[in-house]
From Swiss-Prot:
It is found in: Cytoplasm. Coiled coil: none annotated. InterPro entries: aa-tRNA-synth_I_CS, Arg-tRNA-ligase, Arg-tRNA-synth_N, Arg-tRNA-synth_N_sf, ArgRS_core, DALR_anticod-bd, Rossmann-like_a/b/a_fold, tRNAsynth_Ia_anticodon-bd. This is Arginine--tRNA ligase. It comes from Burkholderia mallei (strain ATCC 23344). Its main location: cytoplasm.
Length: 594
């Protein structure tokens, strides 16, 4: 049911309930509160198209039999002239459930709506006056983007698209942790490689990163190469193995450039890159700490500065400033979120790995302790669990200590079917391979709830059958394109015939089910935005593709008779549009041929 139809039906039912309550109570209780009208899709198709339990809700306060109340509500509903265009039949089930069957014309109306609105179908201006800052990926510039970052990138970009579809002004932000111990470890790792050392050698730093990518950084530094991140100034290797600060700057910029390349291949763009180091250079960390001290939110103990996080529900107070004068990692996070608030973002969503769960209470406690008007529960979080990668039936082993990762680039190349010899060499990959891999990786990583662990099966991503969910959805789109092209070629038809087509021939069970599924799309987007759940769009697309295949297998589209032929093509055109719209939300292509 389309949103406008749903609103109309809710209003009609509300009017009906008012009549029944008025008849039962008269004006004796003006304060009586009517229950909200909740419409649901019955779990069993045979029970109708829409179910409502309002009679059960009214039974106790009115002291009446719920089934009799349901009969009275239905009578009042069907007596309203406006209901005739929506409600075909009404039935009472069980103790008092109201099951409604919608008219064929009301179901067919979705086709005209989709064809008229095109890419805008499903979008809403419900939240047009709201701004939201969405922070995701936010990887340390100490190594390549791995599969966990890939899940964040896919979830974050899709959620940004979904929120934008509901009218939000979305600001995509990447927070670079370019300060602290890990950056120091990156610098000494690169310096050791530049000196000719490798993991296991005498003199290799214990805290160093062991990955081979460190050797690549050291090589380019010694060769005097110039590197630049997308938002920064170029940095040239000084070739001086003793200048640790020069090595640090080069290594950070080198890895930021590599991450930029990975994000570009993945189709993810950011509005802003925010550097942790700027919080220190601008004095924001010190200012935040001073404000918390002034607010009485801290205390000194054993030479360290503690934050009273238990005041805000944490299980124990947390150290802010260690005995050596350095800050613990959550302190700059508090300062960073103050900047988000000061920039006018009253709604902030962070997408992070589930290992960040422990920092939530600390960051929120710090923000509350500042007493600057930030609401409790700020910011919102979407936490995702781990991704395990399977290839050739075996788990791909990773070792953080050894510096071995499954990178985003690996996933794209493997899932795209990169030929042996081209893996690890982007310049050797054709655009089709990159697109195929990107589509598979994005769809797969979005296709499960964020808080569930996910097994990414490369072998499944390469399959070209209905076992592969992204292939299944994309194939539905491509099949429709093929049928419509054949329709135009064989009958000399054009798209102009479709908006005004007679849709009455679309009366089969399969056609009705497909049209109802199309009409659900706006609600799916609204739900995905409200629950911060982009996986709902992936679920929906698989269901829509399934309904299309059921219809296509049950009914010939290009029949001899013009009226049913044009009606069925119109249904296919609407289905194609919604598939395209949904895939676009996920950042996945909608191919016309496969």
């Amino acid at each position: 049911m389309l949103p406008a139809q749903k609103h109309t039906l809710e209003t009609l039912l509300e009017n009906s309930v008012k009549q029944v309550v008025q008849a039962s109570k008269g004006d004796a209780d003006a304060a009586f509160v009517l229950p909200a009208i909740a419409l649901e899709r019955p779990k069993v198709a045979a029970h109708g198209d829409v179910a409502c339990n309002v009679a059960l809700q009214l039974a106790k306060p009115l002291g009446a039999n719920p089934r009799q109340l349901a009969e009275q509500i239905v009578a009042a509903l069907t007596a309203q002239p406006e209901a005739a265009g929506l409600v075909d039949a009404a039935e009472i089930a069980g103790p008092g459930f109201i099951n409604l069957r919608l008219t064929p014309a009301s179901k067919q109306a979705v086709i005209g709506a989709v064809l008229a609105q095109g890419r805008a179908f499903g979008a809403s201006e419900r939240d047009h006056d709201k701004r939201v800052l969405l922070e995701f990926v936010s990887a340390n510039p100490t190594g390549p983007l791995h599969v966990g970052h890939g899940r964040q990138a896919a979830l974050g970009d899709a959620l940004a698209n979904v929120l934008a579809s509901q009218g939000y002004a979305v600001h995509r932000e990447f927070y670079y942790n370019d300060a602290g111990v890990q950056i120091g470890n990156l610098a000494i790792s690169t310096q050791a490689r530049a000196r000719g050392l490798k993991p296991g050698d005498a003199g290799w730093p214990e805290a160093a990163y062991n990955g081979e990518y460190i050797a690549d950084i050291a090589r380019d530094y010694l060769n005097g190469e110039t590197v630049a991140a997308s938002d920064g100034e170029p940095v040239t290797g000084k070739r001086d193995v003793e200048d640790l600060e020069a090595i640090r700057k080069f290594a950070v910029t080198y890895l930021r450039r590599e991450q930029d390349m990975d994000l570009k291949a993945f189709g993810v763009k950011f509005d802003q890159y925010y550097l942790e180091s700027s919080l220190y250079t601008e004095g924001r960390v010190e200012k935040t700490v001073d404000a918390l001290i002034a607010a009485g939110m801290t205390y000194e103990q054993e030479g360290a500065l503690w934050l009273r996080t238990t005041d805000e529900g944490d299980d124990k107070d947390r150290v802010m400033r260690k005995t050596d004068g350095t800050y613990t990692y959550f302190v700059p996070d508090v300062a960073y979120h103050v900047t988000k608030w000061e920039r006018g973002f009253t709604k902030v969503i962070n997408i992070q790995g589930s290992d960040h769960h422990g920092t939530i209470a600390r960051v929120r406690a710090g923000l509350q302790g500042l007493h600057i008007g930030i609401p409790k529960g700020y910011p919102d979080y979407v936490l995702h669990k781990m991704v395990t990668v399977m290839r050739d039936g075996q788990e791909v082993k990773i070792s953080k200590r050894a510096g071995s990762y499954v990178t985003v680039r690996d996933l794209i190349e493997w899932s795209g079917g990169a030929t042996p010899g081209s893996e690890g060499s982007p310049e050797l990959l054709d655009e089709a391979t990159i697109t195929r891999g990107r589509d598979a990786v994005r769809f797969f990583l979005i296709s499960r709830k964020a808080d569930t662990e996910f097994v990414f099966d490369i072998d499944l991503a390469l399959k070209q059958n209905d076992e592969n969910p992204v292939y299944y959805v994309q194939y539905a789109h491509a099949r429709i394109c093929s049928v419509i092209n054949e329709w135009k070629s064989r009958y000399g038809a054009t798209d102009a015939l479709l908006p005004g087509a007679d849709l009455s021939p679309l009366d089969s069970k399969q056609a009705m089910a497909l049209m109802q599924k199309l009409a659900e799309y706006p609600d799916v987007l609204a739900h995905a935005a409200g629950e911060l759940a982009p996986h709902a769009v992936a679920f929906y697309l698989r269901e829509l593709a399934s309904e299309f295949h059921s219809f296509y297998n049950a009914e010939r589209v290009l029949v001899d008779e013009q009226a049913p032929r044009t009606a069925r093509v119109a249904l296919l055109a609407a289905t194609r549009q919604v598939l395209e719209n949904g895939l676009a939300m996920l950042g996945v292509s909608a191919p016309s041929k496969m």
